[in-house]
Amino acid sequence: MISIAALLLTRALPACAGGREIADPSGGNPLFGMAQQMANFVYLVADAATKQAAVVDACWDCAGVAKIAEGLGLTITGALYTHKHFDHGGGAVPERMATGPGGSKIMLEGAQTMAALGAEVFVCAADGPDLASATGLAAVTPLEEGTVL
């Protein structure tokens, strides 16, 4: 399972509890076993006053992340990615790790799905072009050290 931790920047939301599991095997994701082995973490950071949230490294189960946010009454307006690797930002899974039916590439949803859900996508400037290319996005918002969001 992949854990999603919730950290609220102002006063805590009563319904919020850290450590929720996403990437549920009942969802039929062919990559569930890999997701479980990689033990990636996703963080949902929210402002309790505005109910706006940003998600960090949402990749394996974006629908699960969105469902948790919705259940907390939050609107995800930003998706921040720590780096360009497929298991953080999405894109094609390396062939040596997994291929789909008929040898087709398996894609992780990641940044592309979060953008489709209305979130602005952020990543460090050096990884921006690669993440955009890997996920099919026209562009992502670059972050430099010291950027204030």
Q: Each predicted region: which residue ranges?
A:
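Zn-dependent metallo-beta-lactamase
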Residues: 1-72
